[in-house]
Amino acid sequence: MAWSASQYVKFEDERTRPARDLLAQVPLQKIRRAVDLGCGPGNSTELIIERYGADGVSGLDSDMNMLEAARKRLPGTAFVEADLGSWQPMEPADLLFANAVFQWLPDHLDIFDRLMDGLSPGGVLAVQMPDNLGEPSHLAMEEAAHAGPWKTAFEAKSVRRKGLPAPSAYYSRLITKASRVDVWHTIYNHPMADAAAIVEWVKGTGLMPYLAHAGERYREAFLADYLQRVEKAYPKLSDGRVLLRFPRIFMVAVKG
């Protein structure tokens, strides 16, 4: 699945706010080495640099389009192509920071085990993930997938993202290698211009696998069907806008 940095940054302020909120809970005063895991176009990497300085900060991503955008944004920072499913720090890191990436990796609890091993004593694993599969925006994706002439493709193979484990599962796994684990949810309510703006938002993330699976032949028809469902699910407010409810889960683990 190819990502588009230009599509992703259309709502950069809204996407960056959770990264800012996550970083605010990292209890490190200074770092020698920090890695932004799934750095995307570098918006979260930039936050880390603003707080700690550029020395020792790097980013990694599996998508070349995102990496090119990150390198253009922060030309003095090292950005590396890597697969988070198998990546391991070559030397201990003080901060491993992951903003909205691990929801795409179903086995991320096992990956967290490995990442905790890659931290220096007192180092921090900080993670944020969307927890929104039960929201109308994502339920409508599944409804649309099984409603049109493209449905046979989705019946043969589901592209629905796997749901996240319970907060207790994260705590129980992380605390085995941590002296402190904080897990919390935040629900953001984003005012959007209209339902079409919600569609434009998810085109950069959650809707991507659905559009890819529908194929070029049905892409526009799928989008039209999905938009109609989103319009019904998100009624207009008094000023004509709609409100996108967006739950996210956060966790900060300090290695013992």
From Swiss-Prot:
Q: Where is it found, in Gene Ontology cellular component terms?
A: cytoplasm
* Cell inner membrane found in the keyword field: no
Q: What SUPFAM superfamilies does this protein's entry cite?
A: S-adenosyl-L-methionine-dependent methyltransferases
User: Main localization of the protein?
Assistant: cytoplasm
Q: Where does it live in the cell?
A: Cytoplasm
The enzyme's main class, written as a single word, is transferase
Cystine residue pairs = none
* InterPro entries membership: Methyltransf_25 (IPR041698), SAM-dependent_MTases_sf (IPR029063), Trans-aconitate_MeTrfase (IPR023506), Trans_acon_MeTrfase_C (IPR023149)
**This protein is called what?**
Trans-aconitate 2-methyltransferase
